[in-house]
């Protein structure tokens, strides 16, 4: 079982670090570039509609997946009752979700074209939610390799399908936002069918079970968690909607240029959260001291985020030109926006650690108060900054919001777990930041090793990694300790 777990963990990490970033920066970013060349502003409209669908995404789940995984993992014989009951609730929530999106679209004065594609995007989100639900059953049955395969299957299909039209010599006039949205529908549908087929071999039948008391009980238990996710979704995704509504879809495109890279980098924090949640949950339940592993995780993700930010910062312009072929004021504006997003990435990465810890602890009241305040700060800043600064103002508002939530979560964690706030070695961290930034500046601006930007990035990452070892901020032993903790808590 331990060997199975470790091999699956390695498989998940490899798949997520290779396939998903390649999809974001290869397929999605290429679609952005081509659609903006063919019909400027259309990707901005799509990006805004997609972000709006993300804001209300929690209404497709309400914590059902976690509940489903936990119950079936404890007793596999419950899978027929739990799966069928939760599937029925999922379908009911899906109808409500589409109705909610349609209503919000009307309130926001979207035209018929935008309403139509918002509906299709909403349907795609329903397919994604159903895939995640089916995956929760695979995970609960310990079908780990199958779950890993399904986790990236939709992206693989999109890479193959869209990649053919993008790079097989066909005319780029075929590449439109409509093509991209419907390609996602195809990929999600095929993935869902394959996922159902895998589960079908284990449970043999799917049967809808409408149990109203069960629905009410599940929703009531999930409300605090659902409220937290909804509030966080507002300040994570509403900025793009506000940019497009308050300015125009061209400004939304400027935000999207850097955001594609931000999302690729964000895979690091997402994987940390998935790794740590079961570890924190069991340690808290057993009354173990979570301080060492919390600060170890913080050091690891902080160092990774600083390395990425420092290595990318000096060549923001070159990177955006290479990926999107934008020039002039458009490039300068997008680059400044990207800069604020890079700084936000550091705060968000650290938020994954403390947010996961507090969620595992059940500190939902404190987190909801924090998130509500974060929403107010974000919306207030966006309303002031977007009319004047557009995407740059929204990215800056995001940075301030994420810094607020980070410091709030550190303070809450300190009160809940009596942490030593400077347990991580503040002097070493400060020295690491200074040394890494100076190294990046020297390598990039003085062309110390090469004039090729990606070689300079790799060099900065390597030298920064050496600094982290010299300053004893992290060691290979620490990484194995974290993986072993995850292994021990799940097996």
PLM region spans:
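Interfacial segments at transmembrane-helix termini and the short loops linking adjacent helices
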Residues: 35-40, 106-121, 312-345
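Hydrophobic alpha-helical transmembrane segments
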Residues: 115, 119-122, 149-201, 372-378, ...
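Membrane-proximal transmembrane or re-entrant/amphipathic helices at the cytosolic face
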Residues: 441-491
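Membrane-interface junctions at transmembrane-helix termini in multi-pass inner-membrane proteins
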Residues: 71, 127-153, 342-373, 384, ...
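N-terminal membrane topogenesis motif
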Residues: 1-25, 80, 84, 212-228, ...
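Interhelical loop/hinge segments that connect adjacent transmembrane helices in multipass membrane
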Residues: 1-6, 173-181, 193-236, 275, ...
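Signature of the first transmembrane helix
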Residues: 3-65, 98, 102, 124-125, ...
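Helix-loop junctions and terminal segments of transmembrane helices
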Residues: 60-76, 258, 262-298, 355-360
């Amino acid at each position: 079982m331990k060997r199975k777990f470790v091999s699956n963990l390695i498989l998940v990490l490899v798949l997520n670090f290779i396939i998903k970033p390649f999809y974001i920066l290869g397929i999605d970013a290429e679609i952005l570039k081509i659609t903006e060349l063919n019909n400027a502003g259309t990707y901005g409209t799509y990006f805004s509609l997609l972000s709006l669908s993300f804001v209300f995404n929690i209404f497709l789940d309400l914590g059902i997946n976690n509940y489903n995984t936990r119950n079936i993992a404890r007793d596999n014989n419950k899978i027929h009752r739990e799966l069928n009951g939760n599937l029925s609730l999922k379908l009911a929530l899906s109808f409500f979700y589409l109705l909610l999106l349609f209503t919000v679209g009307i309130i926001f004065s979207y035209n018929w074209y935008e309403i139509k594609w918002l509906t299709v995007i909403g349907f795609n989100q329903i397919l994604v939610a159903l895939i995640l639900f089916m995956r929760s059953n695979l995970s609960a049955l310990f079908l780990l390799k199958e779950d890993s395969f399904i986790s990236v299957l939709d992206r693989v299909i999109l890479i193959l399908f869209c990649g053919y039209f993008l790079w097989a010599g066909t005319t780029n006039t075929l590449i439109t936002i409509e093509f991209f949205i419907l390609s996602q529908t195809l990929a999600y549908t095929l993935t869902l069918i394959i996922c159902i087929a895998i589960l079908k071999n284990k449970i043999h039948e799917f049967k809808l079970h409408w149990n109203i008391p069960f629905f009410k009980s599940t929703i009531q238990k999930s409300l605090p968690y659902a409220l937290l996710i909804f509030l966080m979704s507002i300040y994570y995704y509403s900025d793009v909607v506000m940019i497009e509504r308050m300015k125009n879809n061209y400004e939304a495109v400027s935000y999207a240029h850097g955001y594609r890279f931000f999302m690729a980098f964000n895979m690091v924090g997402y994987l940390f959260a998935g790794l740590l949640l079961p570890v924190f949950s069991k340690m808290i339940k057993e009354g173990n001291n979570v301080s060492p592993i919390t600060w170890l995780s913080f050091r690891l993700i902080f160092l990774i985020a600083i390395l990425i930010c420092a290595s990318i910062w000096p060549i923001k312009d070159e990177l955006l030109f290479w990926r999107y072929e934008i020039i002039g004021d458009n490039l300068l504006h997008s680059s400044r926006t990207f800069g604020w997003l890079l700084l936000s990435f550091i705060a968000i990465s650290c938020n994954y650690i403390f947010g996961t810890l507090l969620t595992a602890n059940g500190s939902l009241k404190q987190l909801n108060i924090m998130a509500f305040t974060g929403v107010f700060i974000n919306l207030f800043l966006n309303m002031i900054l977007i009319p004047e600064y557009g995407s740059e103002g929204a990215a800056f508002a995001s940075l301030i919001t994420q810094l607020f939530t980070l410091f709030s979560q550190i303070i809450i964690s300190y009160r809940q777990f009596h942490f030593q706030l400077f347990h991580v070695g503040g002097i070493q961290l400060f020295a690491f930041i200074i040394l890494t930034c100076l190294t990046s500046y020297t390598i990039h601006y003085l062309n110390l090793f090469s004039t090729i930007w990606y070689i300079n990035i790799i060099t900065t990452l390597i030298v920064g990694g050496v600094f982290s070892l010299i300053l004893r901020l992290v060691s290979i032993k620490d990484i194995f300790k974290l993986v072993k903790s995850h292994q021990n808590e799940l097996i």
